[in-house]
Amino acid sequence: MLDIFRGLKSLVKISHVNTDSPVFRLHYSITVIILMSFSLIVTTRQYVGNPIDCVHTKDIPADVLNTYCWIHSTFALKSLFLKEVGKDVPYPGVGNSAEATAADKKIYKYYQWVCFCLFFQAILFYTPRWLWKSWEGGKIHALMMDLDIGICSEIEKKQKKKLLLDYLWDNLRYHNWWAYRYYVCEFLSLCNVIGQMFLMNRFFDGEFMTFGLDVITHMEADQEDRMDPMIYIFPRMTKCTFYKYGVSGEVERHDAICILPLNVVNEKIYIFLWFWFIILTILTTLTIFYRIIIIFSPRMRVYLLRLRFRLVRRDAIEIIVRRSKMGDWFLLYRLGENLDSIIFRDVMQDLANRLHNNQHHRVPGMKGEIQDA
């Protein structure tokens, strides 16, 4: 079991080359590890232990009844969830169902699919990362040329800096499409986490979207007057109806009480995922707004470069941003996070000097204004 968990580290191994943002990494690293771990836990509990244990008379073999109720779902009665336990009902939602209507029955058929659903969710969270990794194509790593460690001879260092500078000079204003692909991947991450909230809401018959809020409300209110949302969605005890032929050839109905110990685990998993997905949604939404500001505000690009790379002179940053486009800014920002700070400062200064002394890359615009993307 521990070996399996250790194997997850290689699945979402984070490269020493930084090509994305911390929020983006939360989606494909932390979240994937969480979902895969939960899937393994549920799978282990489901196939190693007893995920369901139904109680009935000896007329029906226990393994037959357990298998039937596991496959064909169980149910509880909505009208009995607010009844007093120990007096009116043995457990919330469990009672006499002989005259219960179909509308009063709360059917539970999700539990055998939880481990597969969690695994599928993990794949969806990793998909934007896989897409960006394919589109990025190792560009940052190739341009670094081991200049991130800064330990090489001065001659070799000058040669590599000149190669990097020549690339930036020859390809200036040609990186917009490359940057927009990354922004698309961040937007896909936002769509994914929101879509998964709706997916789980459908998975739990419309009960998941407000699950976390309902739990908080229940904890703050008088619990005798409110239905526990965790017990309602993840009951520990339910009912199952089994039909078989009697000795006379007539169909006999048998009601069984089923214990679902796996729901103790499922309850904790999904209350955590609800809050985690809300946090991811908020952070990713803020990131998208941040990207929009960067696209339309060159002055913000200048400010961010100055804030992040303080060794680079302000006039050099302003010249580069004025003569380049948004995609170039994105590439330089990514390079700055990976290169040795002194080397990055030198490259930026050399690029600014070359732009200042040569009008070949001048972008038409209003005099005195920083050129828009």
UniProtKB/Swiss-Prot annotation:
Q: Which residues lie on this side of the membrane: Extracellular?
A: 43-106, 200-268
Q: How does it sit in the membrane?
A: Multi-pass membrane protein
Q: What compartments host this protein?
A: Cell membrane; Cell junction, Gap junction
Domain of life, per lineage: Eukaryota
GO CC annotations?
gap junction; plasma membrane
Topological domain, Cytoplasmic: which ranges? 1-21, 128-176, 290-373
InterPro entries xref list: Innexin
GO BP, sorted A to Z: gap junction assembly; monoatomic ion transmembrane transport; response to light stimulus
Q: Which UniProt keywords apply?
A: Cell junction, Cell membrane, Gap junction, Ion channel, Ion transport, Membrane, Transmembrane, Transmembrane helix, Transport
> What Gene Ontology terms describe what this protein does at the molecular function level?
gap junction channel activity; photoreceptor activity
Q: Where are the transmembrane segments?
A: 22-42, 107-127, 177-199, 269-289
Q: Its principal location? A: membrane
Q: What does this protein do?
A: Structural component of the gap junctions at electrical synapses in distal and mid-depth levels in the lamina.
Q: Identify its protein family.
A: Belongs to the pannexin family.
**PANTHER family in the record:** INNEXIN (PTHR11893), INNEXIN SHAKING-B (PTHR11893:SF40)
What's the protein here called? Innexin shaking-B
User: What is the protein's species of origin?
Assistant: Anopheles gambiae (African malaria mosquito)
